[in-house]
């Protein structure tokens, strides 16, 4: 085994024997891979040069243009593969077929593979079935031949092949029979596939084509041979075992392995099409392979001298006029030698009878169409037959004269006519076609040319006949003259003419000198360049024309192409028409696109399938539909456009929003104008606020739908009505300021991400440029470093030599050890330094990689979210103007919309003016967005190509939910259609997104949660009423002592009127002072005036008081009437929510917190003031109360001032004037009224019954006096009183401090102040302000700073409750920072900490106390005592950051 040189084996040099190599001391040269040994260096080098050339061919794989070593290694790899993959017992079976076979390699592989698959080999190990599911290991000992009938059929086919006059037709017939036999075996094997045939997988990777065949194709059926098998475990032989009882345990080799085996162990001798395969001699001897041909490899000239008659006979068969040729010497090689057949056996038995030979020859002549030609009937003299290129020729047909004798005529039978008629007609047709292209039809072409014509016609498309056809063309090109070449058929004439020119060129080349050859090659190269240039120009021109042609667009309906695939309708539940799927998709897309705004908590998304089921279900869809309504109403009611939405004098945003009140709130939001309560509000607010609710003509709901909602629940409406209301609600939300802000925020975020991305890219480019510049600089410095390194190395070598010379000296030894230790230490330090740098570099790279990945992820997410909030546009339209949609994951699949045009859409395809286009864009709901659309110029050019308009019709939706349908759609879209070209491009660009959506469409829907909507509303109404009653009773806000009977009574109610009476009863049971809103009694606190002034005021305000009471009574009466007239449970829920919102729940004892210690707990020791409802612990009061007093109890702040003065024996009114007292009393009353209004608003905002907090109103019209002038500070009154009474200063301060009650909002603000102070103390830059200054350490501090303050002191004041207002806390905070700025000089560390800490304080105050502003004047050496700063009342709405 060795690589081939070209197609021939190359002998290797034998390795020298050991004795020969041991005798002489001559140097031996050996090649490593082939182990060839040479004594001569010249031979060795010449052989190496030869082996290094790429002229070698691997014998096992056929790979050419390899070096000798590559081919050798490839052969070794194939040998190892065959050891693993090719069992030993198949070797003899395959090699017997290969040896001396003349067919091509592909056919040889197919035949040997079929032989292995249909027959067990001798020596093969298999499983022998001895019982049901019981097998024994056995070995094939003998293969019995088939039965007689099958043998006879085989002999018959072989005999026809062995005929000496067999021709192309016979060989084709044999090949067809074999092919039919293989196909029949394969078809039979499909039904008899055995389950027990276990496949042994190959360790090597097979081609993908074989893998695909294994999946689709079944191995052929075994032939019905019988076998003798020997059991491996026992020494027994069982004879005549049928093939059905044997099972192959190991998979036989595939065709690729067979191909490797045949190439590896056999070689094809010659290059002809019928060249034989010869197995290696070792394997021939090992398996005693029989030789099929005795004289197969004879020289052709010698063979022709022995068999001249064969050529004569073949020439006579090929003549067009069906006449025998006169002379055979004109053609030493017969044309029949080129029409060879693939035969299994070519040797003829010498004992064959004359009759058999005569019959076979006669049959072959009849098939050829030559009736009058028959070979001689006499037996050959020598009894042998000769072979030319694998074809049998009788030895008796030498004499041409005997072959020209006319045989006896016979009567033709019908069978003979049937066989000969098609062949004769074909021969006549071929003969008549030949002279058509000739200028002289009466003159015939030479026989070789005629044979070439027929051979070319039959074999021009066959790969295995190309070499024979090429040789025949060369022969005819040499033989024919120019005139004869012109008479050939056109296609053949061109081939012969080119071959003739090639042969003439070779002759001229042979007689040329070197100069002539160079000149000729130069001209030829120039001509070739010019031709290539011309061809390139023509090719570019053609490509340009093709490209321009492809860019042209035509009307889709004018083009002819594949028909579009038929899609199925979208599967909708019963009761939901297919035409409404578009509205369902619109609602789902809105919820999905604005999920960050509508569903900020990442709630479970609303899907199209579930929404359709909920719409189709009646009572079962209550939970799912109302959840969608709640999601939409949460955003709508908190927006500024819903500030004027009201009912019965209350804003809709203040009513609790639940699943049970959503239906009624939807009706109230979608009204064209608000109820009369809106008019009442407008009367209260004035002309400025009397606009009422906004009217939306574009997105309003029909009145009949809203009238139905008054008498029925939302889930009880029809499917179309529910969907129409959902769509209108989505359109209403699209007009809100929240949506506008959300879209702006997403677009702004997208722009910021683009800027960040560009900055990152710029930074990377800068780094690359810097690294490149650094490499250039290092490249210039490197040679100098190398010179220095070389000098150091030389010095080190000198030192080493000196050390070697003085090695005997002890001092030099010690020095060398020290030097070595120092050098080792230096190397270790250098190594550690390099390791540290490498670790730092790797860490930095990993950090930058993670940062880059996170930035890339954030960028793509931001861009995707920015696209989500824009209008969804279709992917495109097809030839029939059907639109194709790809929605979000909640609406999975590719959807096709048909009949989308209606009367309100003005579809145009001609150029139009700018104004018309803008008007159409406003009118059309389905106008395409600007994103993803082509340029205007291309649109104007392409608009001319569209000449059809979509037709109005029924709106239907279809679904493409399989990859096969999508591929068919892409294949059927025309690439030059105006609409379909764009659609195809977008579908291809988004192919992966569409496949992801199709995959999601296959997931099974979980279904809806079963519920009864009417029962749910009933149960929750009962529980809400009971909850309100219980809270009233526990909080002490009503006149309810025991609610047990009330609860039992409510649980039995089912009628709305009964529930209404319960709610009215609850309203009446609430203590009046704990009501607010439109139910609160309009009473003003009386001012402390003189008796005359009080009488006048009472007379003047009596009419106003009566009007206000009538007004309140009328509002409550309207509410009661609405309760009695309510027809739906959701309406009753809304009215109950109004009552809930009008109760001051923060006044409940459940939420009470001690005013002194501000702590809850110990309810048994907690007492409430009957005037201000503030809570106090008994042990927190001064003096302490040991028991809860009977009757009404007033806190110290609410007790009459005169009573307290008289009880303590103090008099403060003598020295004060009456005007000052009136001014102070008026100021206190105004502040109390303001606080009460603030408390009402705070209570409405802090309601715990809502799903989400409501947005506060922008302006508070009830506080004009507060905005008109700033409130007076309590310090003023305290100072004024100090001027008159100095000895009672402490009592006055305490009385004034307690005269102003602390509201719930202030309690919360004080808690926020404590949190802010705690965070400031923990802030790392606040160390200069945490503790008070030590006067001993810093002596001059008290001289500069008159009023010291620090965080620790502020914290103690907060814990003691010393701060009465947030402004006092802010003043102390400003004092801390002002003292630091006053004492320390510029540039000190304390001032730098001041800036950072003050900025931190500003951020915390803006976050936790946005209603209070922090402003401090930066002045040095000013009076540190702060003045109270009033909040700017006109600052308006806070801007967003």
UniProtKB/Swiss-Prot annotation:
GO annotation (BP), single: post-translational protein modification
Chemical reaction(s) catalysed: L-tyrosyl-[protein] + ATP = O-phospho-L-tyrosyl-[protein] + ADP + H(+)
Annotated ranges, domain DDT: 578-642
Known EC number: 2.7.10.2
Keyword annotations from UniProtKB, A to Z: ATP-binding, Bromodomain, Coiled coil, DNA damage, Kinase, Metal-binding, Nucleotide-binding, Nucleus, Transcription, Transcription regulation, Transferase, Tyrosine-protein kinase, Zinc, Zinc-finger
A Pfam family the protein falls into: WHIM1
Name of the top EC class for this enzyme: transferase
Disulfide cross-links: none
Comp. bias (Polar residues): 386-397, 430-441, 1299-1308
PROSITE patterns, alphabetized: BROMODOMAIN_2, DDT, WAC, ZF_PHD_1, ZF_PHD_2
Biased composition (Basic residues): 398-408, 1251-1270
Compartment(s) where it occurs, according to its Swiss-Prot or TrEMBL record: Nucleus
Region (Disordered): 147-212, 307-338, 364-445, 531-555, 675-696, 766-785, 823-858, 911-949, 1204-1308, 1408-1441
Chain intervals annotated as zinc finger (PHD-type): 1151-1201
Main localization category: nucleus
Cofactors demanded by this protein: Mn(2+)
Residue intervals of the WAC domain: 26-132
PANTHER family to which the protein is assigned, alphabetical: TYROSINE-PROTEIN KINASE BAZ1B (PTHR46802:SF1)
Self-association state and partner proteins as the record states: Interacts with smarca5/snf2h; the interaction is direct and forms the WICH complex. Component of the B-WICH complex.
Function: Atypical tyrosine-protein kinase that plays a central role in chromatin remodeling and acts as a transcription regulator. Involved in DNA damage response by phosphorylating 'Tyr-142' of histone H2AX (H2AXY142ph). H2AXY142ph plays a central role in DNA repair and acts as a mark that distinguishes between apoptotic and repair responses to genotoxic stress. Essential component of the WICH complex, a chromatin remodeling complex that mobilizes nucleosomes and reconfigures irregular chromatin to a regular nucleosomal array structure.
Name assigned to this protein: Tyrosine-protein kinase BAZ1B
């Amino acid at each position: 085994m060795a690589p081939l040189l070209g197609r021939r084996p190359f002998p290797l040099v034998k390795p020298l024997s050991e004795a020969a190599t041991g005798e002489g001391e001559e140097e031996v040269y050996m090649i490593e891979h082939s182990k060839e040994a040479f004594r001569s260096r010249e031979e060795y080098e010449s052989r190496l040069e030869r082996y290094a050339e790429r002229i070698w061919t691997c014998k096992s794989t056929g790979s050419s243009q390899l070096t000798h070593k590559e081919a050798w290694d490839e052969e070794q790899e194939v040998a190892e593969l065959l050891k693993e993959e090719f069992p030993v017992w198949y070797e003899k079976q395959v090699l017997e077929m290969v040896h001396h076979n003349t067919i091509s390699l592909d056919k040889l592989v197919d035949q040997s593979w079929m032989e292995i698959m249909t027959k067990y080999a001798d020596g093969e190990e298999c499983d022998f079935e001895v019982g049901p599911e019981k097998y024994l290991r056995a070995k094939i000992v003998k293969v019995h031949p088939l039965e007689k009938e099958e043998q006879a059929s085989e002999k018959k086919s072989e005999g026809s092949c062995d005929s000496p006059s067999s021709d192309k037709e016979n060989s084709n017939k044999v090949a067809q029979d074999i092919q039919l036999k293989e196909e029949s075996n394969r078809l039979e094997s499909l039904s008899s596939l055995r389950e027990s045939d276990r496949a042994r997988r190959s360790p090597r990777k097979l081609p993908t084509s074989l893998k695909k065949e294994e999946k689709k194709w079944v191995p052929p059926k075994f032939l019905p041979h019988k076998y003798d098998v020997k059991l491996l475990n026992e020494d027994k032989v069982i004879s005549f075992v049928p093939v059905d009882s044997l099972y192959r345990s190991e998979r036989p080799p595939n065709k690729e392995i067979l191909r490797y085996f045949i190439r590896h162990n056999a070689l094809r001798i010659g290059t002809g099409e019928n060249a034989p395969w010869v197995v290696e001699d070792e394997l021939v001897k090992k398996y005693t392979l029989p030789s099929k041909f005795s004289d197969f490899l004879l020289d052709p000239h010698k063979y022709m001298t022995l068999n001249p008659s064969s050529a004569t006979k073949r020439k006579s068969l090929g003549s067009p006029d069906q006449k025998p040729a006169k002379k055979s010497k004109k053609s030493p090689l017969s044309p029949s030698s080129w029409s060879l057949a693939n035969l299994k056996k070519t040797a003829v038995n010498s004992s064959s009878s004359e009759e058999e030979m005569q019959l076979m020859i006669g049959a072959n002549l009849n098939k050829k169409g030559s009736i009058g030609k028959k070979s001689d009937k006499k037996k050959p003299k020598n009894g042998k037959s000769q072979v030319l290129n694998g074809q049998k020729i009788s030895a008796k047909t030498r004499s041409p004269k005997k072959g020209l004798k006319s045989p006896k005529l016979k009567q033709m039978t019908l069978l003979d006519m049937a066989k000969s008629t098609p062949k004769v007609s074909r021969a006549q047709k071929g003969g008549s076609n030949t002279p058509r292209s000739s200028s002289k039809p009466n003159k015939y072409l030479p026989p070789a040319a005629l044979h070439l014509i027929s051979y070319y016609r039959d074999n021009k498309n066959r790969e295995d006949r190309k070499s024979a056809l090429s040789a025949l063309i060369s022969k005819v090109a040499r033989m024919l003259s120019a005139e004869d070449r012109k008479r050939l058929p056109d296609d053949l004439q061109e081939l012969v003419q080119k071959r003739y020119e090639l042969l003439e060129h070779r002759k001229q080349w042979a007689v040329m000198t070197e100069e002539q050859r160079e000149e000729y090659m130069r001209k030829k190269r120039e001509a070739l360049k010019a031709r290539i240039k011309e061809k390139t120009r023509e090719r570019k021109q053609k490509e340009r024309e093709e490209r321009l042609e492809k860019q042209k667009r035509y009307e889709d309906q004018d083009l002819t192409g594949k028909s579009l695939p038929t899609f199925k309708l979208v599967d909708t539940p019963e009761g939901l028409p297919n035409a409404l799927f578009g509205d369902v998709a619109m609602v789902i897309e809105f919820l999905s696109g604005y999920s960050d705004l509508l569903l900020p908590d990442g709630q479970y998304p609303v899907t199209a399938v579930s929404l359709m089921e909920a719409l189709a279900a009646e009572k079962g869809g209550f939970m799912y539909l109302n959840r969608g309504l709640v999601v939409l109403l949460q955003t709508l009611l908190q927006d500024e456009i819903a500030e004027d939405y009201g009912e019965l004098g209350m804003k809709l945003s203040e009513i609790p929003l639940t699943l049970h009140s959503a239906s009624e709130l939807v009706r109230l939001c979608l009204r064209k104008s608000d109820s009369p309560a809106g008019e009442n509000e407008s009367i209260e607010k004035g002309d400025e606020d009397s606009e009422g609710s906004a009217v939306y003509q574009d997105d309003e709901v029909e009145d009949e739908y809203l009238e139905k909602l008054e008498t029925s629940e939302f889930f009880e409406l029809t499917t179309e009505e529910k969907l129409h209301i959902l769509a209108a609600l989505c359109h209403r939300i699209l007009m809100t300021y929240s949506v506008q802000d959300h879209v702006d925020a997403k677009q702004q975020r997208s722009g910021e991400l683009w800027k960040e991305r560009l900055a990152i890219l710029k930074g990377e480019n800068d780094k690359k440029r810097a690294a490149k510049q650094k490499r250039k600089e290092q490249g210039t410095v490197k040679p100098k470093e190398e010179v220095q390194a070389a000098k150091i190395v030389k010095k080190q070598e000198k030192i080493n030599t000196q050390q070697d010379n003085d090695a005997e000296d002890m001092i030099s030894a010690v020095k060398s050890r020290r030097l070595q230790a120092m050098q080792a230490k230096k190397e270790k330090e250098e190594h550690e330094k390099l390791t540290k740098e490498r670790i730092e570099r790797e860490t930095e790279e990993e950090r930058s990689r993670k940062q880059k990945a996170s930035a890339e992820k954030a960028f793509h997410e931001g861009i995707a979210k920015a696209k989500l909030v824009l209008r969804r546009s279709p992917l495109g339209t097809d030839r029939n103007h059907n639109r194709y949609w790809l929605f979000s994951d909640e609406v999975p699949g590719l959807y096709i919309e048909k009949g989308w045009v209606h009367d309100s859409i003005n579809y145009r395809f001609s150029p139009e003016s700018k104004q018309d286009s803008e008007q159409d864009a406003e009118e059309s709901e389905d106008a395409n967005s600007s994103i993803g659309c082509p340029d205007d110029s291309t649109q104007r050019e392409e608009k001319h190509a569209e000449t059809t308009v979509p037709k109005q019709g029924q709106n239907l939706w279809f679904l493409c939910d399989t990859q096969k349908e999508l591929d068919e759609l892409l294949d059927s879209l025309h690439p030059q259609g105006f609409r379909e070209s764009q659609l195809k491009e977008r579908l291809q660009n988004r192919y992966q997104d569409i496949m992801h959506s199709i995959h999601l469409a296959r997931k099974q829907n979980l279904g809806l949660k079963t519920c009864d909507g009417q029962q749910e509303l009933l149960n929750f109404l009962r529980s809400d009423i009971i909850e309100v009653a219980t809270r009233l009773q526990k909080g002490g806000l009503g006149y309810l002592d025991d609610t047990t009977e009330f609860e039992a009574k409510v649980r039995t109610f089912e009628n709305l009127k009964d529930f209404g009476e319960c709610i009215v009863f609850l309203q009446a049971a609430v203590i009046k002072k704990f009501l607010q809103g439109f139910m609160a009694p309009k009473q003003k606190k009386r001012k402390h005036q003189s008796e005359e002034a009080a009488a006048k005021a009472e007379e003047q305000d009596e009419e106003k008081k009566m009007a206000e009471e009538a007004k309140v009574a009328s509002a409550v009466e309207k509410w009661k009437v609405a309760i009695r007239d309510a027809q739906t449970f959701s309406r009753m829920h809304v009215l109950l929510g109004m009552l809930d919102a009008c109760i001051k729940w923060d006044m409940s004892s459940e939420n009470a917190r001690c005013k002194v210690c501000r702590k809850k707990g110990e309810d048994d020791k907690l007492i409430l003031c009957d005037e201000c409802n503030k809570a106090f612990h008994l042990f927190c009061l001064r003096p302490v109360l040991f028991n809860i007093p009977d009757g009404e109890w007033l806190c110290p702040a609410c007790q009459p001032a005169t009573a307290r003065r008289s009880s303590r024996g103090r008099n403060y009114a003598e020295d004060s004037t009456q005007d000052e007292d009136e001014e102070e009393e008026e100021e206190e009353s105004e502040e109390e009224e303001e606080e009460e209004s603030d408390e009402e608003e705070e209570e409405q905002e802090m309601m715990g019954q809502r799903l989400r907090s409501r947005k506060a109103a922008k302006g508070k019209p009830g506080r004009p006096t507060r905005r008109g002038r700033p409130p007076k500070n309590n310090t003023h009154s305290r100072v004024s009183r100090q001027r008159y009474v100095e000895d009672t200063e402490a009592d006055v301060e305490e009385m004034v401090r307690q005269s102003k009650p602390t509201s719930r909002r202030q309690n919360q603000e004080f808690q926020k102040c404590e949190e802010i102070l705690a965070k400031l103390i923990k802030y790392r830059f606040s160390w200069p302000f945490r503790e008070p200054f030590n006067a001993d350490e810093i002596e001059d501090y008290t001289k500069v700073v008159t009023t010291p303050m620090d965080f620790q002191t502020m914290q103690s004041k907060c814990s003691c409750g010393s701060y009465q207002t947030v402004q006092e806390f802010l003043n102390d905070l400003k004092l801390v920072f002002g003292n630091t700025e006053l004492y320390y000089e510029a540039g000190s560390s304390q001032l730098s900490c001041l800036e950072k800490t003050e900025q931190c304080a500003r951020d915390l105050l803006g976050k936790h106390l946005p209603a209070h502003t922090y402003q401090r004047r930066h002045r040095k050496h000013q009076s540190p005592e702060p003045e109270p700063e009033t909040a700017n009342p006109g600052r308006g709405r806070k801007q967003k950051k």
